[in-house]
């Protein structure tokens, strides 16, 4: 993975849409069933919308019925970081981009048991899909 991407909040605001900024830089969550990538079967790679790092592959995407794109694993363990998140009175594991620290979503232990058993529940707005990769 490349070296860390560091920008000022102003630079992020200039680069991202207001919704992308709210979710990725302020740890927000998009409304369920509203994201562009919630339903997509096209093969390709999902990159971080902030820094372009490759994060997830459509081959490992599945329909969890939760309203957000769900994957059973990242493209590479080195592409993400996981952090304990105790916000909103809950105890969850937050998933961030290792390269730029953008908030992507959360990982839960209720994914497909025939693969990893994990569900990476990711905000569509935090991703940029590159078909055919």
UniProtKB/Swiss-Prot annotation:
- Gene3D superfamilies according to UniProt: Peptide methionine sulfoxide reductase
Residue ranges of every copy of the MsrB domain listed in the record: 9-132
Keyword Zinc tagged: yes
Q: Give one Pfam hit by family name.
A: SelR
Q: Which cofactors are required for activity?
A: Zn(2+)
Segments for region (Disordered): 1-36
A GO term for molecular function? zinc ion binding
One GO term under biological process is: protein repair
Can you name this protein? Answer: Peptide methionine sulfoxide reductase MsrB
Q: Which organism is it from?
A: Chromohalobacter salexigens (strain ATCC BAA-138 / DSM 3043 / CIP 106854 / NCIMB 13768 / 1H11)
Which gene does this sequence derive from? Answer: msrB
